[in-house]
UniProtKB/Swiss-Prot annotation:
Natural source organism: Arabidopsis thaliana (Mouse-ear cress)
Name used for this protein in its record: Exocyst complex component EXO70C1
SUPFAM superfamilies, per the entry: Cullin repeat-like
Description of how the protein assembles with itself and partners: Interacts with ROH1A. Binds directly to B1L.
Compositionally biased intervals (Basic and acidic residues): 1-34, 159-177, 438-451
Tissue: Expressed in anthers, pollen and root trichoblast cells.
Length: 653
């Protein structure tokens, strides 16, 4: 293993410390070494190691203070490399992690020899004995750090294997719960995020406190010895491999741009759902857990740059794969049904940012850029809805004046879209800001003030889009209503569609909040106007034939005119009943309101006309010939209207 260039950095750090304070620290380490040596060791070897350590401290202190050091080395100091070398051999046989006390003794010895080597290199003494001792100590130090590096990697990998075993056991015991969770995820596009505290608890169970403590000591010893690059490389390789296994186990292999473009939307929907699930797991479990692990293994304040570099490297390698996939999805052909998956992906990347905020800013910018592209695609897709409304110009009217399929599709689409209200508002607001920034501003009035004065900008960006879609739908329905030759049916069509729209808005808190009360009141007013127009077109002429004007000639009721009036009423009412019983008013409340309003308009007028003029007709066959309906019959036949089923009057009578 080659020693890294970080040795120079370690030297600079050492120079910043006062020699006396470090010597005092060395004394303390020697005392700790003395007290922490296992009782099973012989008394002579215990004292020998402590004496050697103290002799080394004194030796370094002497060399540092004398102006012209002779470079004489005592037997105790001379034996120090060999003593550490023996510890290395012992640890190579037993390995770290078996005895915490022995681990501490070994790591303290490595720290001591590393500091000794670094101090002597700083002094640059021209002494053959010192040079010889330094060469031997350097060789032992390299061997010791190599062992630490090997143990470091082994401990990281062993913990990963234990994690896999624990996960497999958990999956075996909790299989039914897992199946339930998976089915729930498949039933809904929108994943349920895990609680943050649960995420942290799950993320750290694979490393025991003892393992964390040992990893921390090894990392500190390697970095102090000038082997920061080697330590970081081992850590990063192990954790990257762990992440690769994790992603493979949950089924994320990643597909390239060509694959995304080639597969059908149904298959791609499944890939997107898996992507969302995995990225959210990274956001809530894996990345926070990785940050916690990194902070635990490299806790020193001096290691902040190490922590950031390692965390950034790890999350970048994983996140770039996620962003490649989202970038490929953005390039697929746009269509309205894709909006909600795009918004799911947008939200997923938005929620990923807090999990990587401790990483390099460049990575965060990459995520934001990918998020922006998804947002722009969502805006374009939403625009497809507007295009579909404009282009729906069929010339065949919907039978019976029923709710048009375009109305149903648009309102259901908007209802679902409003479940993403906050996200869509954020998307459109960001899009409008970018569009405005890219356009020249010819007005001298400040743009913000202009917007504040504009009523349109008092609602949210997404609300403005909703209003625009509703205006387009209204205009399209108005055109479609003109396809009906019967003006009465035209107003039934407008009432049906208007009522459907209003009920959808009232049934959705999100849409109602976006559209506002004034818009809803305006829609209700339009419905009442359609209702009045229908009454005027359908029943105006019926009421006219029951008018008293023209019935009297020279002060007497003209029987021929009266008979004609009854005939006209019968014919008109028969035709209305025959025709409008086949029409559909799908909303039961509106159907009832229409029948009640017709009854209140027609029945009193007919009862009055019937009661006043029936006596002027000859009784018997003449009366039955011209008076076809009793007043109570009128109410019964009105109740047949708007059911969508033709009714035989003769059969009913």
């Amino acid at each position: 293993m080659e020693k890294s260039g970080n040795h120079h950095h370690a030297n600079e750090s050492s120079e910043n410390h006062d020699h006396k304070s470090e010597d005092h620290e060395n004394k303390q380490h020697s005392d700790e070494l003395h007290s922490s040596t296992p009782e099973s060791q012989s008394e002579s070897s215990e004292h020998s190691l402590v004496e050697v350590m103290e002799a080394v401290v004194d030796f370094i202190q002497t060399l540092s203070s004398e102006k012209d050091p002779l470079g004489e080395i005592s037997p105790a100091v001379e034996s120090f490399p060999e003593a550490v070398d023996s510890l290395v051999s012992k640890m190579e046989s037993s390995g770290l992690g078996r005895d915490e006390t022995e681990d501490s003794v070994f790591i303290d010895a490595v720290n001591r020899i590393s500091k000794s080597v670094m101090r002597l290199r700083e002094l640059k003494l021209d002494s053959t004995p010192v040079s010889s001792w330094l060469n031997r100590a350097s060789s032992v130090q390299h061997r010791a750090v190599s062992l630490l590096d090997e143990e470091f990697r082994h401990l990281l990998d062993r913990s990963r294997e234990e994690e896999k075993k624990n996960n497999n056991n958990n999956n075996h015991h909790d299989g039914s719960n897992s199946d339930h969770n998976n089915s729930s995820t498949n039933d809904s596009d929108r994943c349920v995020l895990q609680d943050h505290e649960e995420a942290e608890e799950e993320s750290f169970h694979d490393f025991s406190p003892e393992s964390i403590s040992t990893l921390k000591k090894i990392a500190g010893a390697m970095i102090s010895a000038g082997y920061e690059a080697e330590c970081c490389m081992s850590y990063e390789m192990s954790r990257r491999h762990a992440f690769k296994e994790e992603l493979t186990e949950v089924g994320f292999e990643g597909i390239n741009v060509e694959d995304v473009q080639r597969i059908g939307w149904e298959s791609l929907e499944g890939e997107i759902a898996s992507w969302i699930s995995i990225v959210r797991r990274c956001s809530t479990v894996l990345f926070p857990g990785e940050l916690s692990l990194c902070n635990a293994v490299f806790p020193d304040q001096d290691h902040s740059s190490v922590r950031k570099r390692l965390f950034t490297g790890l999350v970048s390698a994983v996140t770039i794969r996620f962003l490649d996939f989202s970038g490929a999805v953005v390039l697929t052909k746009r269509s309205s049904e894709k909006l909600f998956k795009f918004l799911d992906m947008y939200e997923t990347l938005r929620d990923l940012i807090p999990a990587v905020e401790q990483s390099d800013s460049d990575l965060i910018q990459e995520i934001k850029l990918a998020q922006t592209r998804l947002g722009e695609a969502a805006v374009t897709i939403f625009g497809e809805l507007e295009k579909s409304i404009k282009s729906d110009n069929g010339r065949t009217p919907v039978p019976s004046g029923a709710v048009h399929p375009l109305t149903r599709y648009t309102m259901n689409y908007l209802k679902y879209a409003c479940e993403y209200k906050e996200t869509l508002d954020q998307v459109f607001q960001h899009y409008e800001a970018n569009q405005t920034d890219n356009k020249p501003e010819p007005e001298t009035k400040p743009r913000q003030q202009q917007r504040e004065d504009d009523e349109e900008y008092k609602v949210s960006a997404f609300a403005r889009q909703m209003i625009r879609v509703m205006e387009l739908l209204d205009a399209n329905l108005e055109i479609k209503s003109r396809l009906y030759r019967d003006p009465s049916l035209r107003f039934i069509f407008l009432m049906n569609n208007g009522r459907y729209i209003l009920q959808k808005i009232k049934g959705s808190i999100e849409i109602r909040d976006l559209m506002g009360q004034s818009w809803t009141r305006k829609r209700s007013t339009e419905l009442r106007q359609y209702h009045k127009s229908y009454q005027r077109e359908t029943w105006g002429k019926v009421l006219q034939c029951m008018n008293q004007e023209g019935l009297q000639v020279n002060g007497k009721v003209s029987k021929p005119v009266l008979k004609e009036r009854f005939k006209i009423f019968n014919a008109m009412f028969d035709e209305i009943h025959k025709t409008q019983s086949t029409w559909i008013v799908s909303d039961e409340q509106m159907q009832s309101e229409l029948r009640v309003s017709i009854s209140s308009l027609v029945i009193p007028a007919y009862r009055s006309f019937f009661g006043r003029y029936k006596q002027h007709l000859d009784s018997g066959k003449q009366t039955d010939k011209y008076v076809k309906y009793q007043p109570e019959d009128i109410e019964s036949f009105i109740d047949d209207l708007f059911d969508g089923n033709p009714t035989s009057m003769a059969r009913k009578r």
